[in-house]
Amino acid sequence: MSKKVVRILRLLIELRYKYLFQFSIVIVERGSKLEVGENTKIIKSKIVVKNRHNLQIGNSCIIKKCTLSFYSDNGWRESSIGSNGNFNGVYLQAYGSFKCGDWNIFEQKSNTPMLTVFNGSLDIGHHNRFMNRFRIRYNANVRIGNYNNINERSWLRADEQITMKDYNQISYNVMIWDTNTHNIYTPSKRRELTEKYYPFFGYEYEKPSTKPVKIGSDCWIAQNAAILKGTELEDEVIVGFCTILLGTSIPFGTTVVNKVEYRFV
C-alpha cells in the first residue's frame, strides 16, 4: 500500500464528519483528544489536534472562519477554550499550551497569524477582547488577566515572560516585547545562516537577550507606544502616544510621555 493511500485512509479515520455540515474540517489525530461543549458552533473553520494534544472547548462558543492548529511540543500537551468564547477569522498555531477562560473575544483583522505559540504557554483569564498578534517562543509564558482590551496591529512578543493584570486598555500599533527578538552575529555568521536557511531570513538558533515585562491593572497605553524588555508598569499608569519604555519601572498612577521639543527655523 502506497504512502499516499495510507495518508488518505488515516485522514478519513481522523476526520470528525459531523462538522462537515457546518462547512468545517475537524481532524483529531489518534492519541489526541478533542472535547466540544454543548451549543458550540464551528462554522467554515478548520481545527487540527495532533501529537497527543488534548483540547477542550467549552459551551456556547462560536468559532467562525478560523484555522486553529494544536500540537504538543516540549512537554506542553493541553489547551482549552472556555465557554461563550467568540473566535472570528483567527489563525492560531499552538505548538505549546493555549488556555483562555470564559467570555473571550478574538477578532483577526489581517492575514498574518494572530496567535503563534512555539514551545511556551499563553494563559488568559475571562472577559477579554483581542485584535492583536501574539508570538511566543523559547518556552516563554504570557499571562493575561480579566477585562483587558488590545486593539488592531498591536503585538505581544515573548521569549521569556509577559504578565498583564486586569482592566487595561491597549491602543493600536502598540509593541509589548520582552526580547531583543534577534541576536547580533558577525557578518560572516549571518551570511552563513542566510545561505543555509534561504529563503528564511533572520534565522535564530539561540534565544536573544530577554527580560520580563510586567503590566499592572487599570493602565492605558496609547497608540504607537513601545513597552520593551525589563519594563514594569504599576497600576493606573498612562503611557502617552509614541512613548518608548525600556528597562524602566513606572510607579503607580503616573503619566509618562516622550519629551517634546519644538524647533523654529
How would you describe each model-predicted region?
Residues 1-178, 183-184, 205-236, 243-265:
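Domain-scale signature associated with acetyltransferase and cell-envelope carbohydrate enzymes
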